[in-house]
Amino acid sequence: KLADCQIGKQEGTELFIVEGDSAGGSAKQGRNRANQAVLPLRGKILNTYVEEIVPKKNSNQNGSEHRTKALSKMISSNEIVTLINALGLDPKVEELDLKDLRYGKIIIMTDADVDGSHIRALLLTFFNNKPFNKLIENGHVYLAQPPLFKINKGTKGIYIKDEKALEEYIINNNKEVKKLKKGSKEYLKALDEEKSIMSIQRFKGLGEMNPEELWSTTLDPETRNLLQVQYSKDLKKDQKLIHTLMGNDVALRKDFIVSNAINVQNLDI
């Protein structure tokens, strides 16, 4: 259920989209109720990717028919319908009137692990579909950056975004590890040994963080990091990548994965 904010205008307000009631509970307690709303998504989010078509001459296909099918695919997900309603928008229109948008910032706040990344990708896929891509084009969609780790040092906690950031933290705070060649057996062994003697907590989800932690790391505008979702200058290239990853062509996606597997540094299985 949507926990709305007190301010009833678009300017200065934020909607946080979170996974489930556990994360939703912490977010609702930790937020600034004046301008921050929270929408927990409970059910499964579907892949709502819709391929844009350009009707060919002498073809039975037309834009209106394609739009109807696209809409049916999007609203087949109860969670997407809930989201559209929370935003104050109408899914049945060809063009969005952004004056109807209830919040200035739409912030996707999923868990920092691979499951959270998957849900984030599905939500971004929805926002890429017309007419909702207008929200991205006009700078309304953001990604929260919650921590995956907490390092306990005495009474203080140091929050770390992900595996890469944890590795960098260890390197910068250990001269012996820093001397070793990155990626070598000696380096990886020293890294694991250092991790084993540190007090590291891995958050399985945002629900494991208490409201104060969630506020200070992810919700507070003074201390948080937000990523604004933007298209690149080469929009066709963006859409080609989205089609490859989220479309129905399995062979195309497999080729992409095989071709880029060599570039993977941190694999979370």
Tell what function each PLM region has.
Residues K1-I269:
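Conserved phosphate-chemistry cores used by DNA topoisomerases
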